[in-house]
């Protein structure tokens, strides 16, 4: 059944040059490959690894800047120094390779370049091993960057609001930030305007308003939905408020209750007894888990879910039971598997709201919490009833706090695929009838065997399974839910093996699939990573974990080749 008609504006093609065997090893004999990947359009490196510099006693940031200054011609920095062209955003240690990871943002005369982020790995002996991320070239030659005439940010917000065509109630006050923006072959200054709202339908829009002319150059919605079929939630008259309704966290005693989920199965629930009520507030993990009731309205977060006897068996409770339980299981998967403490690896609370709107056929991550509709009973049942859906949406938050892949075009499709991969792995972790379908537990409840997407066979639901079959239009943010099928198929082949388009892949299992993609997403992917760059990052991640000459590295290469990504 065809679920959607989407398309993707794809980024430029890539050329890869691999040279000279294996570079010197990272710590603990984890190897770094010697690879150079060039962007064919701008002819500058976008992923380079190997023995890039000699060992020094310098700080990691200085090592990276020294290398970039020596390679100014390759990266087309012009007369600007590396120190003037990049701003260090984060410096962290990588336990796997005992290296230092430096994340950077490209800037031009102090103004950040949209989507141009880089990540570098410097070994403990002070040598640069990996530099990932596309650099915007020849900015000093761009005529529009010489134009200092700009409209005010407030005017840019006004233009974006006019283009939006509705007057929403904003969740966050609109703001406009100045960026250097690459608009096709033209580079200009643009205000990036963020409009975040829930009514009339959820939106977290980014508008790109040219700073001198006020022209709308681009716009897209970064609300991360599980499906692109986003119909506005129909609002009902607000239920009468309970005078005892609670929004803020409560203090009390940890308890264990029970409840029935959307599919009728019984689950144990970590709750908090405060006063005479039991709240869906789980204090037992490194991150507190909260579950709220929107009461069929579109106000967030709603009221903290409460019950009188710690038995959540009413039909209305089911969506909350699953949202609460599955959020905990998703936390457990990331903690047990990667020692990650919540979505930001720093114990951020996990907030979920159920009964959002009326008959709302979607679920989404809005940048700060999870939101689930009840479905209309035909297309969807309550969307919190799918553990892969919850794992999918919370993985968007993990990505937001690591690579921060832009939710448009190839980087957006990669973002979606990563969420499908880990949503599926969370389902396997909980061993709840696991499979390689997405949303099968909550999609078309009256039709057995149906799902939103299939990782084993994306074409089953109209999605491409090979790069040659990709969509090249602009709907759905450039087809983020459609072209994710290409990476989904690659991931399935990597885990399970098989022959696809004449390429045979030796499967390495789902656990190693997760390890490679988690490392690639947190260590090598950047905001604008394309499928081709993702291949390079995943190959290096496998080399870090299993060795440069390992079967796992070979399998990663095979799996990407099988879906036409080189």
UniProtKB/Swiss-Prot annotation:
A single Gene Ontology biological process assigned to it is: proteolysis
Record keyword Zinc present: yes
Binding residue positions for Ca(2+) 1? 307, 309, 311
A Gene Ontology cellular component where this protein is annotated is: extracellular region
Name the residues that bind Ca(2+) 4: 443-444, 447, 450
EC numbers for this chain: 3.4.24.28
Q: Which Gene3D superfamilies match?
A: 3.10.170.10, 3.10.450.40, 3.10.450.490, Neutral Protease Domain 2
Q: Propeptide ranges, please?
A: 28-249
Cofactor annotation remark: Binds 4 Ca(2+) ions per subunit. Binds 1 zinc ion per subunit.
Q: Which residues form the active site?
A: 393, 481
Key words of the record: Calcium, Hydrolase, Metal-binding, Metalloprotease, Protease, Secreted, Signal, Zinc
Query: Where does the chain bind Ca(2+) 2?
Result: 388, 427, 435, 437, 440
Q: Which PANTHER family would you find in this protein's record? A: BACILLOLYSIN, NEUTRAL PROTEASE B
Assigned protein family: Belongs to the peptidase M4 family.
What this chain does, per the entry, is described as: Extracellular zinc metalloprotease.
Protein name as it appears in the record: Bacillolysin
